[in-house]
């Protein structure tokens, strides 16, 4: 069982690295410029990869554009992954905005505000 989990983690890390690379080198869509893949969570049977990303902008419109751009590029990304990875079947990709960094920044700001008041 531990071996299976190790493989799932390894595949997730590999997909994260490759998708970042593909976004930089192969996807020409301006909507995905500035997108960074932060984490990939694999389903146990490796059929689905949840791909979490961040974007430099805080604007909701930019976030929506990035999401749309990623969804449009999914076919290209999967095709490129197929060339790079030695897997029988490339998992389906679902892109989700990673809000953990923004959440962390908000907590930092709240702590600074508290610190300034004391």
From Swiss-Prot:
It holds the Pfam family RBFA. GO terms for cellular component: cytosol. One of its GO terms (biological process) is maturation of SSU-rRNA. One of its GO terms (molecular function) is ribosomal small subunit binding. It is found in: Cytoplasm. Its main location: cytoplasm. InterPro entries: KH_dom-like_a/b, RbfA, RbfA_dom_sf, Ribosome-bd_factorA_CS. It comes from the Bacteria. Keywords: Cytoplasm, Ribosome biogenesis. NCBIfam families: rbfA (TIGR00082). One of several proteins that assist in the late maturation steps of the functional core of the 30S ribosomal subunit. Associates with free 30S ribosomal subunits (but not with 30S subunits that are part of 70S ribosomes or polysomes). Required for efficient processing of 16S rRNA. May interact with the 5'-terminal helix region of 16S rRNA. Belongs to the RbfA family. Monomer. Binds 30S ribosomal subunits, but not 50S ribosomal subunits or 70S ribosomes. This is Ribosome-binding factor A. The lineage of its organism: Bacteria, Bacillati, Bacillota, Bacilli, Lactobacillales.
